[in-house]
Amino acid sequence: MPLRTLLCGLLLAVCLGQHALAASRCSERPRTLLRPAEVSCSYQSTWLDSGLVGQRKIIYQTPLGTPPAGGWPVVLIYQGSFFPLNDFSYHSNLPFGGYYEGKLVQNLLDHGYAVIAPSAPADLFWQTNIPGLAQAYELSTDYDFLGNVLAAIASGHFGPLNAQRQYATGISSGGYNTSRMAVSFPGKFRALAVQSGSYATCSGPLCVVPDQLPADHPPTLFLHGFVDAVVPWWSMDLYYDRLLHQGIETARYTEPLGGHEWFAASPGKVLAWFNAHP
C-alpha cells in the first residue's frame, strides 16, 4: 500500500474517531473572568400522575446513537431539597456542588445511560423521611408517582430503556430517596449511589438504621463529605456498616474537607459503580 494512501487512511480514522468522541447531548463552556463555567445537556419533559395531588413533571434524556438490544440502561436522579431539576443546565457557581451534578448527567449520557429526573412534591423534598409518611410510605404520593415512573420506563414511555438495568442516585433528600428504592421498590434497581444522604427514614442527625436491612438490598455506593454539617458523616457510616455486617456489597468515598455537596470526584465514581453492576 502506498505511503500516501496509508497516511490518508490513518488521518480519516482519527477524524472519525474524534467525531464519535465529540458526539454528545451536552455542551460545555469554560469559566472566564466574567462568567462561571457551564455544562448543559438537552432534555425532554413529560408529566405523570402522582395520586391525590395530580401530575408531576419529569425531565429526561437518552444517549445519542443506537440503543443496545435490551434498551438503554437508565439512571434516576433525585433532587435535593428546594433545588428542583427544571432542566439539565448547571453553572460552576451553584451551591452544594451543583455543577458536578451536571457533570454527572453529562458523564452518564456520554457513556450510554439514559437519565430521568422526577420532581419531588411541589419541587420541595421527598417524602421518604417525613414523620408519619416515613412509616407508612405506601400512603405517600411519592410511592404512587415513582411507581408510575417505573411503569412508564417498562412501557417505553421514555423511549427504548432497559427496565432490567435501572439505577438511582441523588443528593441530600434525594440521597435518602435513593435508599428508599431499596426499601420500597425491591428488585427494581441494579445499584444505588447515595450522595450526602443516609438510610431512607433518617433525617440529618436523627438517624436510626434498622438492625435488619432487606436481603436483596442493591449494591450501594456512599459519597459523603467528612465535615458535612447537614447530614453528618457518621449517619451515613451507620448505614454503610450495617450493609457490611449483612454481607451486602457496598463502598464508601469520603471527601476529607467536603461539606454537603456533590464533589468533583462524584461523576466518575458513580459511573464506575454503575458500570460495575450491569
From Swiss-Prot:
One GO cellular component term: extracellular region
Signal peptide: 1-33
Record flagged with keyword Secreted: yes
UniProt cross-references to Gene3D superfamilies, sorted A to Z: alpha/beta hydrolase
The enzyme's E.C. designation: 3.1.1.76
One GO MF term: poly(3-hydroxyoctanoate) depolymerase activity
Keyword Hydrolase: yes
EC primary class: hydrolase
Alphabetical keyword list: Hydrolase, Secreted, Signal
Predominant subcellular localization, coarse grouping: secreted
Localisation per UniProt entry: Secreted
InterPro entries: AB_hydrolase_fold, Plant_Biomass_Hydrol_Est
Catalytic activity: Hydrolyzes the polyester poly{oxycarbonyl[(R)-2-pentylethylene]} to oligomers
Functional note: Hydrolysis of poly(3-hydroxyoctanoic acid).
UniProt-recorded name of the protein: Poly(3-hydroxyoctanoate) depolymerase
